[in-house]
From Swiss-Prot:
Enzyme Commission code: 5.1.1.3
UniProt keyword Cell wall biogenesis/degradation present: yes
Protein origin, superkingdom: Bacteria
This protein's UniProt keywords: Cell shape, Cell wall biogenesis/degradation, Isomerase, Peptidoglycan synthesis
The reaction(s) this protein catalyses: L-glutamate = D-glutamate
Organism of origin: Rhizobium meliloti (strain 1021)
NCBIfam families: glut_race (TIGR00067)
GO BP terms in the entry: cell wall organization; peptidoglycan biosynthetic process; regulation of cell shape
Pathway: Cell wall biogenesis; peptidoglycan biosynthesis
Task of the protein: Provides the (R)-glutamate required for cell wall biosynthesis.
Protein name as annotated: Glutamate racemase
Amino acid sequence: MTKTELKPILVFDSGIGGLTVLREARVLMPERHFIYVADDAGFPYGGWEEGALKERVIALFGRLLAELDPEICIIACNTAFTLVGADLRAAYPQMTFVGTVPAIKPAAERTRSGLVSVLATPGTVKRAYTRDLIQSFASQCHVRLVGSENLARMAEAYIRGDALADEAVLAEIEPCFVEAEGKRTDIVVLACTHYPFMSNVFRRLAPWPVDWLDPAEAIARRARSLVPLPNGFEPLNGEDPAIFTSGRPDFATRRLMQGFGLRVMADAVSADRRERI
């Protein structure tokens, strides 16, 4: 398989949080081109009704797979994958989907206090998938689920360079910090790919030090294990394409994409198709 024959890797998120996963995946798969897809027309996913979101994502992937023909798809969005992952695999059995789920298992393995918090969107918190992970891997721990209504939007603003009030951020993360029977929360799972961009802010504002668990590297390792590595490959240079379902990313977003080595495609998903999403 030559370099020109290698199919790209599709990285999908509701917004720009999936860039945390893209960054790690590029390190592990330097021989591949990537296509970043942001469903910003539907952002944020956390407040969507489940049936409507499921229908939207499945239909969108039907078009993306037909047009882009990727090697695999990385769903860099906890909210989407915990809801739609099984349905995507059933609808498109020829495609390999690498999912993003709350990193509850590694958190349970690392905690010393037994107090773990999961910072997520409301959608991820209410999924049976998330509670099944807790039952399967963290039944011996006290796991607090914290569903933030605002933090994904705040993270998008922060990534674009907007200033955020410390008090507003603290109000979102403070419920993660639990004290019980002389013990304290020692791990917070970042169960939204937007949140790691704000990890330094979280550390600065945290009532006490904790391990902020970012799953991006583990997701990238899983993807690498599923993608064939050709002999004699050379690392690729140049920009990769980015697709926004709104077709209208603002200037700050375009500049951010350039910083990640991405160029925004003007007409990768045609307007008439977007209207039917």
